[in-house]
């Protein structure tokens, strides 16, 4: 084996290092998929797509009927990646402060103290996102687009990575509404189980 640059001008040792890195990454992806497959059966294509989006630091929208494993997929993914996860169950009366947090009076210091909401996590499961108001969705939109949240005039940085897996029921289900384009634009993919 000769040393030095190959015909593309790339050093052979650099090529070998890159190939070894790709092999390690492929092995890690395969391990991740195998771990998720323990919890979700028969959904290999969806699991692979979700894995790719996670590697790209994207957000995922899962649309399907209740009971098909959307929540189980998100929870098993967080466990397999050893990420902190939290969940928001969206309802028509969910408020932005239910997502980002709120300030309360600290009786010891007599000052307002910010209490972080569930969005301050690595993997957020936004369950039934199309059941809540557009005002509440806007709070999540900032988090997904910028990795920050603004509450009461202050901006807070979210943990890195920050990934949202949102679920929605089909628009034909009662109590649902179509997500606005500005919200849909924050998701890298929309998948069905």
Task: Please state what every model-predicted region is.
Residues 5-7:
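Compositionally biased, intrinsically disordered low-complexity segments enriched in Pro/Arg/Gln/His
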Residues 60, 124, 162:
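Conserved beta-strand position immediately N-terminal to the Walker
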């Amino acid at each position: 084996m000769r040393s030095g640059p190959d015909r593309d001008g790339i050093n052979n040792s650099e090529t070998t290092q890159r190939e070894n890195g790709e092999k390690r990454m492929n092995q890690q992806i395969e391990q991740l998929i195998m771990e998720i497959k323990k919890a979700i059966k028969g959904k290999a294509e969806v699991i692979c797509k979700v894995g790719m989006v996670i590697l790209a630091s994207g957000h995922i929208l899962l649309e399907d009927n209740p009971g098909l494993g959307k929540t189980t997929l998100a929870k098993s993914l967080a466990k397999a990646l050893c990420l902190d996860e939290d969940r928001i169950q969206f309802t028509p009366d969910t408020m932005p402060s239910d997502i980002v947090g709120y300030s309360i009076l600290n009786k010891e210091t007599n000052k307002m103290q910010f209490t972080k909401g569930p969005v301050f996590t690595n993997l957020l499961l936004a369950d039934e996102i199309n059941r809540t108001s557009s005002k509440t969705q806007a709070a999540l939109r900032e988090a997904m687009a910028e990795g920050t949240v603004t509450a009461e005039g202050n901006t807070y940085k979210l943990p890195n990575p920050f990934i949202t897996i949102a679920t929605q029921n089909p628009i034909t289900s009662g109590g649902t509404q179509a997500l606005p384009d500005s919200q849909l634009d924050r998701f890298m993919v929309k998948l069905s189980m």
